[in-house]
Amino acid sequence: MAFQECVIEVAQDQAEAWSDALFDLCALSVSVEDADADTPDEQPLFGEPGLEPTKLAWNRSRVVALFGDDTDPALAVAAASNALGIDPVPAYALREVEDQDWVRLTQSQFEPIRIGERIWVVPSWHDAPEPDAVVLELDPGLAFGTGSHPTTRLCMQWLEQNLKAGETVLDYGCGSGILAIVAKKLGAGDTLGIDIDPNAVEASRYNAERNQVQADFALPESVSEATYDLVVANILSNPLKLMAAMLSARVRAGGRLILSGVLERQAEEVAAAYAPWLPLTVWRSEEGWVCLHGTRP
């Protein structure tokens, strides 16, 4: 069976309506993407699980609908446009998608990733490329963080080069738990991962068990306000600015703070938000993203 993928670029306030209309017209699946993804104009969206997001789509959104061979995408787009009162019908692109072993295809897209000098992130269906490597077995799943994004790589490289054996670590916004797990594998002492999403906490616990490391993971309201030698937060610039006082307070005197999820153009304003508590500078940048670090006096 062959499928057809239809791609339409729409305005931010039309993305949800187009998605609903195409679903009503027999689309098998519909997704909305940032039309500026992987460019300097990429626009991160964030929100808390269980709450309505502040924005439902990107300024320039790309609606991608998949149709079976029993549906004409051109007719569906025309009908959706008519139902939405949009004239003329917007331009769209079609691409044929052949049916295949989707599990095998998905697995083939996730190869082992080398990060820094010694760290490898390896899906469970692959063997470790180097016997003496620091290996994290991690599959794509519910929570963010498989080592493929520049911000995750930057934080892992920082830990590889700067973590001292026995240092206590707080991973705030732990996602998949990848940073807490690699910290333990690099010799960290007591390590805690915190996330506001219960699914992320469960995913982190599962990944830690698979990797045979002892680390704790919890929701923020269930842990004490202890201080740590290292606090790492790979989130996004706006939440990082809002949490400046709280995250700074979790760093012990003489301890270090590592932040990522920050674009190069956002680095100065994030550093300014933390300036009352500790100085932050750019440690390294990659693909337009930066890792900030600093020591608390």
UniProtKB/Swiss-Prot annotation:
S-adenosyl-L-methionine binds at T152, G173, D195, N234. It is found in: Cytoplasm. One of its GO terms (molecular function) is protein-lysine N-methyltransferase activity. GO terms for cellular component: cytosol. Its EC number is 2.1.1.-. Its main location: cytoplasm. It comes from the Bacteria. It catalyses: L-lysyl-[protein] + 3 S-adenosyl-L-methionine = N(6),N(6),N(6)-trimethyl-L-lysyl-[protein] + 3 S-adenosyl-L-homocysteine + 3 H(+). Keywords: Cytoplasm, Methyltransferase, S-adenosyl-L-methionine, Transferase. Methylates ribosomal protein L11. Belongs to the methyltransferase superfamily. PrmA family. This is Ribosomal protein L11 methyltransferase. It comes from Cupriavidus pinatubonensis (strain JMP 134 / LMG 1197) (Cupriavidus necator (strain JMP 134)). The lineage of its organism: Bacteria, Pseudomonadati, Pseudomonadota, Betaproteobacteria, Burkholderiales. The gene is prmA.
